Design a protein with these regions (language model features):
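Bacterial Sec signal peptide processing site at the extreme N-terminus
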Residues: 17-44
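Hydrophobic helical h-region of N-terminal Sec-dependent signal peptides
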Residues: 9-19
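Gly/Thr-rich phosphate-binding beta-strand-loop-beta motif of the actin/hexokinase/Hsp70
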Residues: 62
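Bacterial N-terminal signal peptides that target proteins for export
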Residues: 1-10
Length: 209
C-alpha cells in the first residue's frame, strides 16, 4: 500500500432542520446532528471488480476502496459488545433494495439497501446511526451512504471487517459524528407501508429530511 493516500475532501454539510432544535450541522470532525443530514462524496471506480468495503469497528467507519484509493467514507454503527459485527474477510452474499426484517421483535421494519455478508442474518443496510456500537451485529449506514454503497457494490464484493484501518486517523477522523438517538421513532404504520420504500428512493425517510 502506498504511504500517501489520496484523501477525500468532505464538502461542508448544509444545516438541516429536523424535528428537534438541538439537531445541528457543523464542520467535518465535529457533531453533525443526525445521519439524515449526511451525504458522502463519492468517486466512481475505474474498475468496479476491484472495489472493496472496509469496516473499522473501533472507529465505526466504513470505506469503499479501490486499491489504496478511498472512493467513499462514512460513519456507521456496528455491533455492540454482546453481539459484535463478525471480524474477517467476507463477501456480499445477496443484495435487496427493499427489504423488511422477518424476525421478531421488529418484524416488518424496513432494512433498505440490504447487503448480506458473513451469513444471511448479517448485513449492511440503512438504519439509525449512533456514535457508539449499538446493533445486533449488522452495520447500519446513513440513508444516502447506504444507497451509494449499494450502487457501488455487487454480489461477491469483499467486505473486510477489522478493528481499525489505515484511514481511521486521517479520512475517518475528518468525518462528522452522527447521532440519531434524539429522533423519535416514526409511526409503525409508516414504517410498514410501501411509502417507506418510495421515500427511500428519493433519499428521505418520514419527515426527518
Amino acid at each position: 500500500m502506498k504511504k500517501t493516500l489520496r484523501l477525500l475532501t468532505l464538502p461542508a454539510l448544509a444545516a438541516t432542520t429536523l424535528l428537534l432544535n438541538s439537531c445541528q450541522t457543523t464542520t467535518s470532525g465535529g457533531t453533525s446532528g443526525t445521519a439524515f443530514s449526511f451525504d458522502p462524496p463519492v468517486t466512481k471506480p475505474s474498475n468496479p471488480s476491484a472495489v472493496k468495503v472496509r469496516i473499522s469497528t473501533s472507529a465505526q467507519r466504513l470505506y469503499v476502496t479501490e486499491g489504496d484509493k478511498v472512493l467513499l467514507a462514512s460513519p456507521v454503527a456496528v455491533g455492540k459488545a454482546s453481539s459484535p459485527t463478525p471480524a474477517g474477510t467476507h463477501r456480499i452474499m445477496s443484495k435487496t433494495r427493499h427489504r423488511r426484517r422477518v424476525s421478531s421483535p421488529g418484524a416488518g421494519y424496513p432494512m433498505t439497501y440490504w447487503m448480506s455478508f458473513y451469513s444471511a442474518a448479517y448485513g449492511m443496510h440503512w438504519g439509525f446511526v449512533k456514535p457508539y456500537p449499538c446493533t445486533a451485529g449488522c452495520v447500519r449506514m446513513p440513508l444516502k451512504t447506504a444507497k451509494k454503497v449499494f450502487d457501488m457494490t455487487r454480489v461477491g464484493t469483499p467486505v473486510i471487517v477489522t478493528r481499525s484501518t489505515p484511514w481511521d486517523s486521517s479520512i475517518g477522523a475528518r468525518l462528522p459524528t452522527l447521532d440519531d438517538s434524539p429522533l423519535p421513532n416514526p409511526p409503525d404504520g409508516y414504517m410498514k407501508s410501501s411509502k417507506v420504500f418510495a421515500d427511500q428512493e428519493q433519499g428521505k425517510m418520514w419527515n426527518f429530511n
